[in-house]
């Protein structure tokens, strides 16, 4: 049999362990707040204005949907048939874009990273930056630098997306063979392999008003 001292010790051990056993898990940090939600979802549930978005949660829209998120002074917006997952980073947010269209507006001294098809887009300088990104296919992006230049990084290559331009960007993980000199009949030693092919598209139209951000 247990001695009174042994029983008392066992009881104390049980009481000490109770707070840990029944402790409420630490909630994930809030990333942002929904400012617009029409035919939209937060994770698998219908979204509405005022909902908090927590670390690692997904946002999405239906065919005619629209959704806006405020993350401090950063604004994000999705148009129809779009989806993304949000994460906190130092001074801003990281967006894992999965499909559709994304618009973002980021003031100076804030940080936005958009990860799409294994490419990473971010402001090229510490300044107000507004941009629109579309996933066209699993290898093609359309990027509009509405205000401020963007830096595009894909594997070990980088490109600057110039302000005021729209580009169609083809990403080739194996590298596309290209002539460096541009002359027909160049010998094989003058060929290089680039993983990023950029084509200039149409001019930019749109901004905060078009995307319904206030």
Show which residues each predicted segment covers:
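Bacterial N-terminal signal peptides
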Residues: 9-19
């Amino acid at each position: 049999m247990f001695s009174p001292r042994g029983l008392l010790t066992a009881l104390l051990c049980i009481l000490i362990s109770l707070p840990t056993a029944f402790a409420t898990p630490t909630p994930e940090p809030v990333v942002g707040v929904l400012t617009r939600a029409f035919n939209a979802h937060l994770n698998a549930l219908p979204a509405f204005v005022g909902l908090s978005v927590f670390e690692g949660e997904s946002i999405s829209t239906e065919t005619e949907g629209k959704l806006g998120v405020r993350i401090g002074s950063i604004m994000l917006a999705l148009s129809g048939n779009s989806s993304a997952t949000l994460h906190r980073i130092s001074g801003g947010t990281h967006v894992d874009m999965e499909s559709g269209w994304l618009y973002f507006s980021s003031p100076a001294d804030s940080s936005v990273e958009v990860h799409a098809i294994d490419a990473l887009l971010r402001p090229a300088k510490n300044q107000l930056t507004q941009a629109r990104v579309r996933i066209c296919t699993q290898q093609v992006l359309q990027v509009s630098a509405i205000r401020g230049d963007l830096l595009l990084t894909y594997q070990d290559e980088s490109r600057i997306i110039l302000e005021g331009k729209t580009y169609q960007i083809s990403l080739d993980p194996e590298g596309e063979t290209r002539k460096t000199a541009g002359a027909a009949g160049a010998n094989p030693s003058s060929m290089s392999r680039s993983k990023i092919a950029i084509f200039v598209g149409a001019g930019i139209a749109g901004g905060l008003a078009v995307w319904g951000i206030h």
